[in-house]
């Protein structure tokens, strides 16, 4: 079933619980292999991502930049690609601000060579509303989609 290509496939590893906290990423030991990548979940800044605040500040941007720089120096600069396997923010702030957040997050990660996957749990309302695509109406939340696309360009 693998087609005999396992020796050339990329193996994605994570820190403990895919955490981006220093204690978790400092303990990651990457084997000497060109086909390894690391995936981290990084919901940051946490107060915005979790909906405890509805502002996305310059200090929040600095926090993201610092973490991306750290991940680059710890892994990418040593030959291990970095993937943000999950990130996002709940629907506490306006969709316009959330779109701006997605654009900044993705474009800033891109500067450090980091690829990102936005988390969409299919929920468009309530405390854990990470949804960006309405699965009943088959419609995107346009401002969020625009932020994602603009950040990736």
Segments from the language model and where they lie:
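Short, acidic/polar
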Residues: 64-72, 101-106
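Acidic-and-aromatic substrate-binding clefts and catalytic sites of carbohydrate-active enzymes
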Residues: 16-22, 62, 90-99, 124-125
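Aromatic-rich peripheral "rim/lid" segments of glycoside hydrolase catalytic domains that contact
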Residues: 94-153
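N-terminal substrate-binding region of glycoside hydrolase catalytic domains
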Residues: 12, 56-59, 91-92, 137-140
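Residue-level detector of secondary-structure boundary/capping sites
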Residues: 6-7, 62, 96, 107
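Acidic/histidine-rich helix-loop elements
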Residues: 47-64, 135
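Active-site region of glycoside hydrolase catalytic domains
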Residues: 1-53, 69-89, 111-112
């Amino acid at each position: 079933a693998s087609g005999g290509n396992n020796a050339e496939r990329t193996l994605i590893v994570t820190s403990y619980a895919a955490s981006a906290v220093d204690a978790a990423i400092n303990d990651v030991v990457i084997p000497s292999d060109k086909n390894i990548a690391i995936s981290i979940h990084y919901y940051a800044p946490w107060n915005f991502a979790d909906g405890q605040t509805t502002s996305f500040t310059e200090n929040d941007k600095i926090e993201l930049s610092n973490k991306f720089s750290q991940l680059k120096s710890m892994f990418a600069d040593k030959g291990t690609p970095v993937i943000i396997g999950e990130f996002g923010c709940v629907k506490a702030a306006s969709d316009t601000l959330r779109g701006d957040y997605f654009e900044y997050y993705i474009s800033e990660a891109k500067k450090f060579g980091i690829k990102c996957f936005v988390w969409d749990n299919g929920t468009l309302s309530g405390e854990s509303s990470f949804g960006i695509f309405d699965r009943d109406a088959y419609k995107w939340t346009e401002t969020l989609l625009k932020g994602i696309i603009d950040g990736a360009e």
